[in-house]
Regions:
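Preference for protein termini
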Residues: 1-181
Length: 183
């Protein structure tokens, strides 16, 4: 599934690149914000963002999304969730439809076990690529079985939000965290 955002001629679709450049310019105006970088690194070194027994590496420059890019991602993810729920419900309701999936019989039996809650897909992670020049979106993968990256994202965000660079950027713009639980 690909989604293309409407765009006026000769206009960038999103402000993300401009936000990133502004953030870098702020850091440069603060002589690189060396104290902020050191504090961010120290935070990460004592954080829970650990993969394969190592603290994750990160950039001092966070990924900055404007409202338009968040809206595109929200629409794509919510539409995809609705489609997947319809497919899942049809699978549960129609024995003939289940045949096209060719699941191992043990798995098919487990899928049909009553859930005990209303949501068909209570948790999902949709990994997408957003082309910030065109607004096109492409999927990398769908996950309904894990929360990979959520802790790391939270810790990386916390590592920079007390820096002088981040505070100055946030003074100029409305900034809020990008929740991996719900966009």
């Amino acid at each position: 599934m690909t989604h293309t955002a409407p765009q006026p001629a000769d206009q960038p679709v999103f402000k993300n690149a401009a936000y990133t450049q502004e953030y870098i310019n702020i850091a440069e105006s603060l002589d690189g914000d060396i104290p902020g970088r050191r504090a961010a690194r120290a935070y990460m070194d004592s954080s829970t963002a650990i993969v394969h027994h190592r603290v994750v590496s990160t950039s001092f420059v966070p990924k900055l999304y404007d409202t338009a890019s968040r809206q595109v991602m929200r629409e794509v993810v919510e539409t995809t969730h609705r489609i997947l729920c319809k497919v899942m419900q049809h699978y549960l309701d129609d024995a003939e439809y289940r045949k096209i999936f060719d699941y191992d019989p043990r798995l098919a039996e487990l899928i049909l076990v009553p859930r005990g809650y209303d949501a068909l897909l209570p948790f999902a992670r949709f990994d997408i690529f957003l082309d910030e020049n065109t607004g096109d979106v492409a999927f990398c993968e769908f996950n309904g079985d894990g929360s990979s990256g959520m802790n790391e994202n939270r810790e990386i965000t916390h590592s920079v939000e007390e820096t002088a660079t981040f505070k100055e950027f946030a003074r100029r713009h409305h900034v809020e965290g990008l929740s991996l639980i719900h966009i």
